[in-house]
Amino acid sequence: MSSSVGATLEAIKYTRGSLEILDQLLIPKSFIYEVVDTTEKAFHAIRDMKVRGAPAIAIVAVLTLAVEANQLLQSNDALLADASAIAKLFNEKLDRLAESRPTAVNLFQAVGDFKNKIAQSLETNKTGTEIVQLIIDEAEALMNRDIEENAKISECGSDHIISTNPSSTTLKVLTHCNTGALATMKYGTALGVIRFLQKKNVLEHAFCTETRPYNQGARLTAFELVYEKIPSTLICDSAVSYLFKTKKIDAIIVGADRVCNNGDTANKIGTYHIAVSAKHHGIPFYVAAPFTSIDLTLASGDLITIEERSEKEITHYRNNDERAVVENIGVWNPGFDVTTADLISGFFTDIGVFTPLTCATTGKKYYDLKTQQAEKLKQQ
């Protein structure tokens, strides 16, 4: 383990054969990088939320496979001679990793993609060594794509907000949970947009919610904002509506763990009520996410599986495990909620901005992201 944080904030440190993650449960009190070199370590790091954020979860999962694949190559393990055995081994590892967090679509897409590539390798008579090398190469490619995607999201999102506020150089924005460099390889999604607004000298202030019960906003986003010297204020989750009423907020930007074809969006618990209040107060509400977070196979948010987390996250103090509430009270602790598409002003993605379509007959606003994606790609 190491405890140094460099000039550039990194949640994930990777070189071929080596993977370390910043234990986000300890921030801001401590900065400890933990070695992750087995599937089981990755499973527990993801499940226990030492690493979190949909893109980062997928990246840590596949980079762990890359580390294990590199170990096989370096040891010249006899297993490399058996392509079927190699495929079986890594498919089992992928299945295990998929069990860690049920809501983040990026992880399931990565697992599916890697399984397909392994199957194709067997069909084309690749050797065990070639399959192992493929796993390393594909994992590193996913890591590099995430960096590129975040930069594109941040650029197009900040440009869109500026274009819809053309006379303002004093923008005030709100974000929820943590969607920055700690949730990705670099920049972040929603927090990346805020970073780019600051870089373009149009941001006056960023507000972040504490994000109960795990306090990702208070522990992580507040830390990132201060680290980047962005003017910022932390508020209680329950203060959001009063903030909207008393301060001039120009935009809300959140991330996403899963987006449906119709635009319904699963994100950290508390997102939905922020969107409802934003609609009431006439403030645009944006979702920033890589297009890989959009599950075009899901018609609506009713089909999203919502992770329910331990009641201890609410009933006990995290630092000393002491009970904070009366015994025998019922507890409901969903980790996510679903914001309906009618509350969302637009999606900032790595392939551009998606705003609602208008039905020609009814005038009703709606999203059809599969169709909109196809149209967007035609234009590029």
Curated annotation (Swiss-Prot):
Top-tier EC class: isomerase
GO molecular function, one term: S-methyl-5-thioribose-1-phosphate isomerase activity
Pfam families in the record: IF-2B (PF01008)
Gene Ontology CC annotation, any one: cytoplasm
Keyword Nucleotidyltransferase: no
Active site: D257 (proton donor)
Pathway: Amino-acid biosynthesis; L-methionine biosynthesis via salvage pathway; L-methionine from S-methyl-5-thio-alpha-D-ribose 1-phosphate: step 1/6
Reactions catalysed according to its record: 5-(methylsulfanyl)-alpha-D-ribose 1-phosphate = 5-(methylsulfanyl)-D-ribulose 1-phosphate
GO BP, sorted A to Z: L-methionine salvage from methylthioadenosine
Protein localization: Cytoplasm; Nucleus
Keywords associated with the record: Amino-acid biosynthesis, Cytoplasm, Isomerase, Methionine biosynthesis, Nucleus
Main location: cytoplasm
TM ranges: none
The enzyme's E.C. designation: 5.3.1.23
Name this polypeptide is given: Methylthioribose-1-phosphate isomerase
